[in-house]
Amino acid sequence: MAGRVWRSLVDVGPERKLLLAGFSMGGYVALQMLAMPLRNVEGLALLCSSAHPDQPEAAPLRERAISAAARDWPRYVEKIGEFLMTAVARADPALREAILADLREAGADSTIAQMRAVMTRPDQRSMIAGLMLNALVVAGSDDPLIPIDDARAAAQAIPQARFELMPGAGHLIPWEQPQALAMLMRSWITQTLNET
C-alpha cells in the first residue's frame, strides 16, 4: 500500500512540503512510506496508530474477525462498530449511524484485505527513532485497539514528536471528536510548515 501512495504523489513537485497523516491502518501505511522514503517528508501525524507489530496472540482473533466479515458482512459491521464506538457515540443515533455507514461502505473484501495487511505489518519501532521530522501522535483514552502506552512510546521514540491524549475518545476520534482533532491537526500543520 505504501508504494501505491508514493506513486499517487509522483506529480507533487519537490518544492512542495509533504506531511503524512495516517489514521489507524493509515498510520501503518505512513510508517511504511517513511521506511522506504522516495522523497523528503517534513511531518508525520499518527492518529490511533502505533509503530508496534501485530501481537502473535492477536492472530486467532483477527482470523475469527476475517471469517465473520466474510460470512455475514452486515452483522460484522454492527459488531465491530459497537466494539469500536465509545458509549457516547453509541448513545448518539446520528453519530452511530454515520460510523456504521462508513464501515459498511468500506466493504467486506477491502476490510478483509486490510486486516490481513495489519497482521503482517512490520515492527517500525527502530525506524521511527531515526526520523527527523515534526510529528504528532494522537491517542484516545478509551481506544480498545491501540494501547495508550504503544502510542506514547511512538511519540517518545521520535525525536521531534508531541503526544496528545484525547480524554473520552476511543479508536474513532475522527468521528467522535472531529473538532478537537481538527484543532490539533491545524496547529501541527501550521507549526510544521513554519519550522521547515
Q: Where would I find each of the regions flagged by the language model?
A:
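Active-site loop/oxyanion-hole signature of alpha/beta-hydrolase fold enzymes
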Residues: 1-21, 27, 32-37, 183, ...
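Conserved alpha/beta-hydrolase catalytic His-Asp/Glu region
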Residues: 54-60, 72-130
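Catalytic active-site module of serine/aspartate enzymes centered on a nucleophile-bearing elbow/loop
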Residues: 161-196
